[in-house]
Amino acid sequence: MSDRLTLLRPDDWHIHLRDGAALANTVGDAARTFGRAIVMPNLVPPVRNAAEADAYRQRILAARPAASRFEPLMVLYLTDRTSAEEIRTAKASGFVHAAKLYPAGATTNSDSGVTRIDNIFEALEAMAEVGMPLLVHGEVTRAEVDVFDREKQFIDEHLRRVVERFPTLKVVFEHITTGDAAQFVREAPANVGATITAHHLLYNRNHMLVGGIRPHFYCLPILKRNTHQEALLDAAVSGNPKFFLGTDSAPHARHAKEAACGCAGCYSAYAAIELYAEAFEQRNALDKLEGFASLHGPDFYGLPRNTDRITLVREEWQAPASLPFGDFDVVPLRAGETLRWKLLEAGA
């Protein structure tokens, strides 16, 4: 068993960097490991057009550590009113790489999201024409649907129809959490892929609920039962190029998580590749990590692979109990616990 693991530099195909003072912390954590990241647009107000995406991109670039080459890949937030012209303008910008479907009310800052899938068909047609991928938060939001069933229900009610109606549209089913989603992606045409988070590979709902409620495991889509966790691990280590890394690292200030009505999101960017390495090692599949983390994503998006490399070493270290987050602090995933892999910093 090797104690060193060298990979082409990975990318994160789903991250939340937030905005304002928090960028000074979140951008550095992401840039430490990743060459590029697909940056979620669910700000307040959301990133709805190329001009807003450019302004946000400039704020991210200004927060990069010195000498960093980290590249934010910007995303539009689809609304019921997103036009085909806005899609074409965004594609022509060269820095907007996708558009995101948030069903209204599905997750953090999704109130401006899409109320009916049919309302964005004009935008989806334009996206298919210009080659812009659709990123999907795949959950229905009707009150009568159990929170643990919302992903499967979304597949049956909406996603199959979108994939069939727009056969040339690239679709990324983001942060999949169920065996149903993994099976759907495997059986779908080649233009359908999926991201998987480290926390959905490492944890299930028992970790969040047994022995007391642990708010720092609370995320959306919510952690599912262990059989779904195993199905996600199967998909991640399979070598299937449809599955690739997307952390969904989503920081919230401590007081917003440790509350009577806490926010959804796990902060993993500070040690993302180390956490994925632990998950892959559980399956004796470290040889499949580079494909999942560094190759499948850029290949799906039609972007060049990174050419530089990172090295992980088998070395135990203690995750910090908290990290700075703008004017507050954030409790990261695995806070205070021991991690088994460590990223070698440049020059180490």
Curated annotation (Swiss-Prot):
It catalyses: (S)-dihydroorotate + H2O = N-carbamoyl-L-aspartate + H(+). The active site is at residue 248. Homodimer. One of its GO terms (cellular component) is cytosol. Keywords: Hydrolase, Metal-binding, Pyrimidine biosynthesis, Zinc. GO terms for molecular function: dihydroorotase activity; zinc ion binding. Pathway: Pyrimidine metabolism; UMP biosynthesis via de novo pathway; (S)-dihydroorotate from bicarbonate: step 3/3. InterPro entries: Amidohydro-rel, DHOdimr, Dihydroorotase_CS, Metal_Hydrolase. Its cofactor is Zn(2+). Catalyzes the reversible cyclization of carbamoyl aspartate to dihydroorotate. This is Dihydroorotase. Transmembrane segments: none annotated. PANTHER family: DIHYDROOROTASE. It comes from the Bacteria. The lineage of its organism: Bacteria, Pseudomonadati, Pseudomonadota, Gammaproteobacteria, Pseudomonadales.
